[in-house]
Amino acid sequence: MDKQKSAPSKWMISSMVVVAAIVALAIFVVVSNLGGKPAVDTSASTTPAGEVSPAGAPMTSATAAAGSSADGGASFCGLTAVEMTGTLTKAPVATWQLFGTTYVPAVDGHGPGKIDDDGYRHCYARTPTGALLAIANYDALDNPGTDAFTEKFVRTGTAPGPGREAAIEKLNEKLKQSATESSNPADRQIFQTIGFRILSYDGNTALVETASKSSAGYKVAWVQHLVWAEGDWKLLLADDASSLTDPTLISTLDGYIPWSA
């Protein structure tokens, strides 16, 4: 990593994992306040290969429900592919489409099975490929940067339960403040998926780690929890709408499966 570069400012990336993520719709919290440079050159990813649960990830009522709840229903948009076990050992062949300033993937039969008129992408197959596609597309939902997109994701893209309810409450508070606040688009960073690995998958839950590169040149990895609910893959939030795991700055893609447009 170029030590002359300053570390990226704190950005809660992608839609949904932390309170600021829900507000800002950006899927990676890039480490901030590092004194102008990363404190450690973190070449290791958020979760070492072979581990299926990041250390310190809190148990939530949503997590417990995901492990013991029923099916979650058939695909709400009619995707028929279902795999209750499995993983990915190579990158799926995807069609990449420019969405805002980020390329997003699609795989026939695995999703997204529904793209709304406003560009909102959802409905992914109950397969390891579908889970990966869900995360890669959710990462890009920040691009439109509208309150409507943010609210839609919080209400439909997060797992039902206390985390979603807390997120809606936080979002409503943010929307009330937005009339008196302003942001500088130039301060925002855009993230592009460049790699992944599936840490665990059982058809009801998935633990997916993605590696992305920011517009400032930094690489970041983050493990994200998905649960199958309401006929789609949903991002799992802690009960207070905070993140279940933290992102990590990385220097290489060692250990990841490269995957990009």
Roles of regions detected by a PLM:
Residues 2-3, 131-143, 208-213, 223-228:
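Primarily hydrophobic membrane-targeting regions of prokaryotic envelope proteins
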